[in-house]
């Protein structure tokens, strides 16, 4: 099989979920009722759901079997200790707090790190800025809710869809250090390393870049949090593209990666393959005070620290899923599936970001050049794709980025992308071919697609619940 051009899915399908086919008229009515926001569509009205890979994929048989071991004790559950042991073995982190999902971890650690910086370094809350290679939307939202400005420092190649570059998710190291000096190191409560960089197109971060970033952070005594939703995909790209690690296992690369952070926050619904779950973990005793404070907040916001909003069976499933998500054959198939979709789209003239780990990212700005950024071309494209084929995708652009919380002005976005997110072990190559064919029809009518404007705009994380209409 080593010389075959295409390999089939490395799994057998045992349980299926029927989906219904709808008419164009039905879909047009549904998208209008949703306020031109695919997030607000009913799932039963979606034929292929590419909204997210977060908790929407299949689980392995070993994960499902592990649920039967669940200890549902309110405190001291043995299922918690199984999960904590997996974290120690995989990441080398000593302290584990389970959460219901990634944003549960964010709402705990962000205020704790801000308070710690204020008490120990005299942080000025009116001047504080957190840095990242690119903040995920909820991380940005929780930072802003806590009064912290966020600044993304990414390399110039990151959003140029005409450029191929191995590690488009990398930090701009000079920009990072320059930014720290500009705002004052004591006013930087944390740095977040997002692997892979979702908003840049699921693009990986190299180990060399993470090492250099961590060195800068240590120079200024700034804590680093690894946003770890797609840690296994990032490790796979390092193995494929960073020569020094080509003979390392995914497990070895993962362990090495986490030397270059102090904490990890994870939506386990991605690479750990679970329908629900998250993690907040600290590396060693140097962050025991943060761990203690976060445990206290966990009780109030998530649940007792040995379950954190998860039932025992879910913790057992997560303890196994962390391992199953690192399977090399599985990762090779998953990355190849994304590449197949990107190649097919580009063959019909649809410009995409280079293939990343979890999704194809269509350059909506180039497909719909007549729609200005403030009329959200990628959101308009998402609505058209649903009308044409019942495919639900998600905008990653100006609509998602939102407004400056201080000025109320739209933040400038480096690219207007439509994310076609592939749930794990859910769709086959035939589905990918259908998506490509759908874009042929969309492309034929591209010049007639209209921009969008708000009828309802929430102040925080607007893309989830906003409503729009055609201009």
Swiss-Prot record:
Keyword Acetylation belongs to the record: yes
Single GO molecular function: tryptophanase activity
UniProt cross-references to Pfam families, sorted A to Z: Beta_elim_lyase
EC identifiers of the protein: 4.1.99.1
PANTHER family named in the record: BETA-ELIMINATING LYASE-LIKE PROTEIN-RELATED, TRYPTOPHANASE
Family designation: Belongs to the beta-eliminating lyase family.
Subunit structure: Homotetramer.
Name this protein carries in UniProt: Tryptophanase
